Amino acid sequence: MRLEALAVALPEVTGHPNRVPFEGVLTLVDEPSNRPPSGARGHRVILTREAALAALPSLMGMAVDYAPGWDGHDARRKCGIITRADVEANRLRVSGYLFGKDFPEVEDRMRSGKAGMMGMSYEIADAHVEDMNAEIWKLTRATFTGAAILLREKAAYRNTSFQLAAKHCREFASRRAPADRPRRLNERNIFQPEKGKEARWK
Protein backbone atom coordinates (compact mmCIF):
# COMPACT_ATOMS: atom_id res chain seq x y z
CA MET A 1 0.00 0.00 0.00
CA ARG A 2 1.41 3.40 -1.03
CA LEU A 3 0.52 6.56 0.82
CA GLU A 4 1.19 10.13 -0.27
CA ALA A 5 -0.10 13.01 1.85
CA LEU A 6 -0.08 16.78 2.20
CA ALA A 7 -1.51 18.93 4.98
CA VAL A 8 -1.89 22.56 6.01
CA ALA A 9 -1.16 23.03 9.72
CA LEU A 10 -3.68 25.20 11.56
CA PRO A 11 -3.36 26.12 15.23
CA GLU A 12 -5.74 24.20 17.47
CA VAL A 13 -8.56 26.21 19.00
CA THR A 14 -10.60 24.13 21.41
CA GLY A 15 -14.34 24.43 20.85
CA HIS A 16 -14.06 26.78 17.87
CA PRO A 17 -17.70 27.30 16.75
CA ASN A 18 -16.82 27.76 13.09
CA ARG A 19 -14.51 24.76 12.72
CA VAL A 20 -16.38 21.48 12.38
CA PRO A 21 -13.94 18.72 11.33
CA PHE A 22 -14.91 16.55 8.36
CA GLU A 23 -13.36 13.69 6.42
CA GLY A 24 -14.18 12.04 3.14
CA VAL A 25 -13.14 10.28 -0.04
CA LEU A 26 -13.05 12.84 -2.83
CA THR A 27 -12.52 10.44 -5.74
CA LEU A 28 -10.85 7.23 -6.86
CA VAL A 29 -7.64 7.20 -8.89
CA ASP A 30 -6.81 4.93 -11.82
CA GLU A 31 -10.47 3.85 -11.98
CA PRO A 32 -13.17 4.99 -14.42
CA SER A 33 -16.05 6.99 -13.03
CA ASN A 34 -19.40 5.24 -12.79
CA ARG A 35 -21.07 7.98 -14.79
CA PRO A 36 -19.91 10.93 -16.90
CA PRO A 37 -19.10 14.02 -14.83
CA SER A 38 -20.66 17.29 -15.88
CA GLY A 39 -18.29 19.04 -18.24
CA ALA A 40 -16.91 15.78 -19.69
CA ARG A 41 -19.16 15.84 -22.79
CA GLY A 42 -20.77 12.52 -21.94
CA HIS A 43 -17.49 10.68 -21.32
CA ARG A 44 -16.65 8.77 -18.20
CA VAL A 45 -13.24 9.74 -16.86
CA ILE A 46 -10.16 8.29 -15.18
CA LEU A 47 -7.97 10.46 -12.98
CA THR A 48 -4.55 8.86 -13.08
CA ARG A 49 -2.63 8.36 -9.87
CA GLU A 50 0.25 10.43 -11.21
CA ALA A 51 -2.08 13.32 -12.03
CA ALA A 52 -3.74 13.11 -8.61
CA LEU A 53 -0.41 13.15 -6.76
CA ALA A 54 0.89 16.04 -8.84
CA ALA A 55 -2.30 18.00 -8.13
CA LEU A 56 -2.38 17.42 -4.35
CA PRO A 57 -0.71 20.77 -3.55
CA SER A 58 -3.43 22.60 -5.48
CA LEU A 59 -6.07 21.00 -3.25
CA MET A 60 -4.68 22.51 -0.05
CA GLY A 61 -6.77 25.42 1.18
CA MET A 62 -9.49 24.92 -1.42
CA ALA A 63 -13.12 25.26 -0.42
CA VAL A 64 -15.90 22.72 -0.22
CA ASP A 65 -19.29 23.89 -1.44
CA TYR A 66 -22.82 22.57 -1.77
CA ALA A 67 -26.03 23.12 -3.71
CA PRO A 68 -29.37 23.42 -1.86
CA GLY A 69 -30.64 20.17 -3.40
CA TRP A 70 -27.38 18.32 -2.58
CA ASP A 71 -27.24 17.27 -6.22
CA GLY A 72 -24.42 19.31 -7.71
CA HIS A 73 -21.98 22.19 -7.36
CA ASP A 74 -22.36 25.81 -6.34
CA ALA A 75 -18.98 27.50 -6.01
CA ARG A 76 -20.55 30.55 -4.34
CA ARG A 77 -21.74 28.48 -1.37
CA LYS A 78 -18.32 27.83 0.10
CA CYS A 79 -19.05 26.16 3.42
CA GLY A 80 -15.67 24.78 4.44
CA ILE A 81 -12.00 24.30 3.68
CA ILE A 82 -9.74 21.35 2.85
CA THR A 83 -6.62 21.17 5.01
CA ARG A 84 -5.35 17.65 4.32
CA ALA A 85 -5.31 15.27 1.36
CA ASP A 86 -3.73 11.89 0.77
CA VAL A 87 -3.79 9.12 -1.79
CA GLU A 88 -3.99 5.70 -0.19
CA ALA A 89 -4.37 2.72 -2.51
CA ASN A 90 -6.97 3.98 -5.02
CA ARG A 91 -8.67 6.55 -2.77
CA LEU A 92 -8.01 10.27 -2.66
CA ARG A 93 -9.01 11.14 0.88
CA VAL A 94 -9.50 14.64 2.25
CA SER A 95 -10.21 16.24 5.58
CA GLY A 96 -10.75 19.76 6.82
CA TYR A 97 -13.34 21.96 8.46
CA LEU A 98 -16.91 23.01 7.77
CA PHE A 99 -17.85 26.55 8.74
CA GLY A 100 -20.44 25.33 11.22
CA LYS A 101 -21.40 28.73 12.62
CA ASP A 102 -21.84 30.30 9.19
CA PHE A 103 -23.57 27.28 7.63
CA PRO A 104 -25.53 25.50 10.37
CA GLU A 105 -27.76 23.89 7.76
CA VAL A 106 -24.81 21.94 6.37
CA GLU A 107 -23.78 20.61 9.76
CA ASP A 108 -27.41 19.76 10.56
CA ARG A 109 -27.69 17.81 7.31
CA MET A 110 -24.60 15.78 8.14
CA ARG A 111 -25.91 14.94 11.59
CA SER A 112 -29.48 14.11 10.58
CA GLY A 113 -28.78 12.14 7.39
CA LYS A 114 -28.24 8.40 7.15
CA ALA A 115 -24.69 7.09 7.39
CA GLY A 116 -23.08 6.68 3.99
CA MET A 117 -25.59 8.92 2.23
CA MET A 118 -23.24 11.76 1.30
CA GLY A 119 -20.39 11.83 -1.19
CA MET A 120 -18.03 14.28 -2.86
CA SER A 121 -17.14 15.61 -6.27
CA TYR A 122 -13.98 17.42 -7.31
CA GLU A 123 -13.75 20.70 -9.18
CA ILE A 124 -10.84 21.15 -11.56
CA ALA A 125 -9.31 23.50 -14.09
CA ASP A 126 -6.59 23.11 -16.72
CA ALA A 127 -7.47 19.45 -17.26
CA HIS A 128 -5.47 17.56 -19.89
CA VAL A 129 -7.06 14.55 -21.59
CA GLU A 130 -4.74 11.96 -23.10
CA ASP A 131 -7.04 11.15 -26.04
CA MET A 132 -10.14 13.25 -26.68
CA ASN A 133 -11.46 10.54 -29.03
CA ALA A 134 -11.32 7.80 -26.40
CA GLU A 135 -14.55 6.42 -24.97
CA ILE A 136 -13.23 7.01 -21.44
CA TRP A 137 -11.20 10.15 -20.98
CA LYS A 138 -7.92 9.72 -19.09
CA LEU A 139 -6.90 12.84 -17.19
CA THR A 140 -3.12 13.17 -17.12
CA ARG A 141 -2.97 16.61 -15.54
CA ALA A 142 -5.32 18.91 -13.66
CA THR A 143 -5.51 21.62 -11.02
CA PHE A 144 -7.96 21.21 -8.16
CA THR A 145 -10.05 24.33 -7.53
CA GLY A 146 -12.42 22.94 -4.91
CA ALA A 147 -14.90 20.18 -4.16
CA ALA A 148 -18.62 19.76 -3.65
CA ILE A 149 -20.56 17.89 -1.00
CA LEU A 150 -23.51 16.07 -2.52
CA LEU A 151 -25.62 12.95 -2.30
CA ARG A 152 -23.40 9.99 -3.11
CA GLU A 153 -25.89 8.71 -5.67
CA LYS A 154 -25.49 11.98 -7.59
CA ALA A 155 -21.69 11.77 -7.78
CA ALA A 156 -19.83 10.43 -10.80
CA TYR A 157 -18.01 8.02 -8.47
CA ARG A 158 -20.33 5.95 -6.29
CA ASN A 159 -17.62 5.14 -3.75
CA THR A 160 -16.96 8.67 -2.56
CA SER A 161 -17.95 9.66 0.97
CA PHE A 162 -18.36 12.64 3.27
CA GLN A 163 -18.99 12.73 7.01
CA LEU A 164 -18.18 14.68 10.13
CA ALA A 165 -15.04 13.47 11.86
CA ALA A 166 -15.85 10.90 14.54
CA LYS A 167 -13.90 12.78 17.23
CA HIS A 168 -15.97 15.91 16.72
CA CYS A 169 -19.23 13.97 16.86
CA ARG A 170 -18.26 12.59 20.28
CA GLU A 171 -17.18 16.00 21.55
CA PHE A 172 -20.37 17.61 20.27
CA ALA A 173 -22.54 15.09 22.08
CA SER A 174 -20.67 15.64 25.36
CA ARG A 175 -20.85 19.43 25.32
CA ARG A 176 -24.34 20.19 24.00
CA ALA A 177 -25.66 23.36 25.58
CA PRO A 178 -28.91 23.46 27.60
CA ALA A 179 -32.01 24.41 25.63
CA ASP A 180 -32.39 27.68 27.56
CA ARG A 181 -28.86 28.87 26.81
CA PRO A 182 -28.94 32.33 25.15
CA ARG A 183 -28.12 32.23 21.46
CA ARG A 184 -25.58 34.56 19.93
CA LEU A 185 -26.49 36.68 16.98
CA ASN A 186 -25.14 35.23 13.74
CA GLU A 187 -22.80 37.37 11.72
CA ARG A 188 -23.66 37.93 8.11
CA ASN A 189 -21.55 36.18 5.49
CA ILE A 190 -20.26 38.05 2.48
CA PHE A 191 -19.34 36.08 -0.63
CA GLN A 192 -17.14 37.20 -3.48
CA PRO A 193 -18.23 35.54 -6.76
CA GLU A 194 -15.57 33.48 -8.50
CA LYS A 195 -14.11 34.86 -11.68
CA GLY A 196 -13.42 32.75 -14.74
CA LYS A 197 -14.74 29.38 -15.78
CA GLU A 198 -13.80 26.06 -14.27
CA ALA A 199 -14.71 22.46 -14.93
CA ARG A 200 -16.81 21.40 -11.96
CA TRP A 201 -17.13 17.67 -12.37
CA LYS A 202 -19.34 15.43 -10.30
Ranges and model annotations:
Residues 1-22, 133-135, 163-202:
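Intrinsically disordered, low-complexity terminal tails
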Residues 1-59, 175:
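Polar/acidic, low-complexity leader/linker segments enriched in S/T/G and N/D
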Residues 6-13, 76-87, 128:
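Short amphipathic beta-strand and strand-loop transition segments with alternating hydrophobic
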Residues 17, 64, 73, 85, ...:
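Intrinsic-disorder/low-complexity regions
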Residues 26-37, 54, 70-74, 101-107, ...:
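Short, surface-exposed beta-strand/loop "edge" segments at domain boundaries and coil↔beta transitions
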Residues 36-49, 55-63, 105-125:
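Extended Gly/Ser/Thr-rich low-complexity repeat segments
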Residues 54-92, 96:
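A broadly used, surface-exposed interaction patch
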Residues 83-174:
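Residue microenvironments linked to proteolytic maturation
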